[in-house]
């Protein structure tokens, strides 16, 4: 099984914190996510607040962090929401993504689907241990 993230790209509407004026949209989204849950493929999913509520941490070549508060100008590069699924193949991920309800009816929108790195699911304690080991190795390398 491979985990995929279905990313709904932001629009001017989502960045303004507005929702489409479609009374059935929420019901369609909920029904679709419920169907994925019943099929055993849904791991998580949520909409995101506009980028005005977020921040970015930029690192220079020396590893110094600089925080930039939103909003961010390039709406087409932002994510408005995500759904995380666990499916046997790319074709299965594509099949689910194609059935995703149009998140912003009447507006063009893009959904991007990408596999997560690391195809093996680990228990949380093992995942945490591996992350700590990787961070320690990075620190040792400088």
How would you describe each model-predicted region?
Residues 1-142:
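Conserved, structured core segments of small domains
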């Amino acid at each position: 099984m491979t985990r995929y993230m279905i990313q709904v790209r932001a629009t001017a509407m989502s960045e303004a914190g507005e929702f489409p004026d479609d009374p059935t949209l929420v019901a369609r989204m909920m029904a679709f996510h419920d169907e994925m849950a019943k099929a055993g493929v849904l791991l998580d999913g949520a909409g995101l607040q506009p980028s005005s509520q977020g921040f970015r941490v930029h690192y220079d070549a020396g590893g110094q962090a600089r925080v930039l508060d939103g909003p961010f100008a390039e709406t087409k590069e932002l994510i408005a929401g995500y759904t995380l699924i666990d499916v046997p193949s790319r074709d299965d991920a594509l099949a689910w993504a194609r059935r995703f309800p149009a998140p912003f009816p009447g507006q063009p929108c893009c959904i991007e689907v990408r596999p997560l790195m690391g195809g093996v699911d680990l228990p949380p304690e093992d995942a945490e241990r591996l992350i700590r080991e990787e961070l320690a190795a990075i620190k040792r390398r400088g």
